[in-house]
A protein has these predicted regions:
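N-terminal hydrophobic/helix-forming segments and targeting peptides
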Residues: 1-463
Length: 463
């Protein structure tokens, strides 16, 4: 055998998506990317993601809690949807789980204050952010206010062209030498100074007893539009997020740039794949979880018992006894994907990447056999038999993928929800597209990876 043939036969070489797909698939790729950009531009909170999913599911004939083709929503921040397969549920399920929360700024319980005739909203950051990312850029307000009379008032300000936007002011470089420039990057912007500028005109009238007239003007405006008072902030979920639409990035339009791609890119692709799979062999279950970015705490997260309730209901409605034995027997036959993004190699920061093992943008869905950090702490590690089965099916269906880790061993790491689901006994692996600028207000994904993630999920749900 010639050396060239030997090399081709025995060595591994990653494949670029655009070098492997034909014009028909490139057209489909662009269509999916356009749909994704529209989704990403309007869906910026967990509640908005659930609302989007519910609308799409009902349009496709899914009914709440229907046994054969149904969905379940909990607290408006968790969504599950399923369709029964040809094989009985005792043969196991095909599960894809992603998370729909994203790093952001939450308003504090008592957020509104006035200082030097300017009105601000105080925030508390949610999830892992670099605080300097959030200053000096246009911001929008998304969320809901729960009134004592039971009404839920939805608020979105800063997304329409006619809307005002908000911002967090930065300090000019002329005055920033001691307070910012001489400090570590992580200390230059402190959390308590992530105050959002919201108003600067005093309320009309000259009553000297009223001291905070700009704050009162803000309250007057928000009361006229939404009927809420200052006390209503206590029972509100109001988030500060980047304003504006997702965009194509690059002169060749090869990337999608926008907020919240970790992990709504996996939510979007898994839901789209799920809706397109007809008559699956195994029961398909898609889960959209909350609170992953803060350790999966709370009753809408992967640590909650809500997943067990869904499985027990499926068991019961299948005519089986809803016993722990049946539950765990089904789990041991279940195959799952923890659909989450990973860090793509950024050539500007090669000192933290392992070039041989980390994911490259444009080379397909990234499969992380294990997560965690250091000595694989806090990690799930997929069994190789399951990984080989999955990759064989992807090969047969021409899915372009790469198997990767995330960064050099001692540089850090990350976790996903897979370890919580692995505890039930199912086979599960992490897979999703690599991103640049992850956890920033403007994350970057490659269209080729977006498309291959959708294709990989669709293949998995079929087999």
């Amino acid at each position: 055998m010639k050396i060239e043939e030997l090399e081709k036969e025995l060595t591994y070489k990653a494949k670029h998506v655009y070098e492997e797909i034909d014009e028909e698939e490139k057209n489909l790729l662009e269509k999916i990317a356009k749909e994704y950009i529209e989704f990403l531009s309007i869906v910026k909170t967990e509640r908005e993601t659930v609302e989007f999913g519910k609308e799409l599911l009902e349009k496709e004939g899914f009914k709440e809690n229907d046994f054969k083709k149904g969905y379940f929503i909990y607290k408006n921040k968790f969504l599950a949807c399923w369709k029964l397969g040809k094989k009985p549920i005792t043969e196991g399920l095909r599960i894809i789980v992603s998370h729909i929360d994203t790093p952001r700024l939450d308003l504090k319980l008592h957020p509104l204050f006035e200082d030097t005739d300017l009105a601000f909203l105080k925030t508390h950051y949610y999830g892992g952010i670099k605080k300097y990312h959030w200053v000096a850029q246009p911001l929008a307000l998304h969320g809901v206010v729960a009134k004592k009379d039971g009404r839920i008032i939805k608020i979105v300000i800063g997304e329409n062209k006619e809307d005002p936007v908000f911002t967090i002011c930065d300090l000019l470089p002329h005055l920033a030498k001691k307070i910012q420039a001489e400090k570590k990057l992580s200390e230059a912007i402190v959390g308590e100074k992530l105050n959002v500028l919201v108003a600067g005109i005093p309320v009309e009238g000259k009553d000297e007893k009223v001291k905070e007239k700009v704050k009162l003007k803000f309250l007057e405006l928000i009361y006229k539009k939404y009927g809420i008072k200052e006390e209503d902030f206590v029972s509100a979920e109001l988030y500060i997020v980047p304003a504006g639409s997702a965009r194509e990035v690059g002169l060749d339009r090869s990337f999608v740039g926008g907020y919240g791609q970790d992990d709504r890119i996996c939510a979007f692709t898994s839901l789209k794949a799920f809706l397109e799979v007809e008559d699956p062999e195994y029961t398909n279950l898609i889960l959209f979880m909350d609170k992953e970015e803060i350790g999966s705490e709370g009753n809408t997260s992967a640590k909650s018992r809500i997943f067990e309730g869904i499985i027990y209901n499926l068991i019961k409605n299948s005519g089986l006894s809803s016993t722990a034995d049946n539950f765990f027997n089904i789990m041991t036959k279940t195959k799952a994907i923890s659909a989450d993004v990973t860090a793509g190699i950024d050539p500007n920061y090669m000192e933290v990447h392992d070039k041989l093992n980390d994911a490259k943008l444009g080379f397909g869905i990234a499969v992380s056999r294990y997560t965690g950090h250091g000595g694989k702490y806090m990690a799930n590690e997929a069994h190789v038999e399951f990984l080989a089965w999955l990759l064989k099916n992807w090969d047969e269906n021409k899915v372009i993928y790469q198997v990767c880790s995330m960064g050099k061993v001692d540089e850090g790491g990350g976790g996903t929800v897979s370890k919580y689901f692995a505890s039930y006994g199912m086979d599960i692996v992490d897979a999703g597209p690599p991103l640049l600028s992850m956890h920033s207000p403007f994350e970057i994904a490659h269209k080729g990876d977006l498309y291959m993630t959708y294709k990989a999920f669709k293949t998995f749900l079929k087999v």
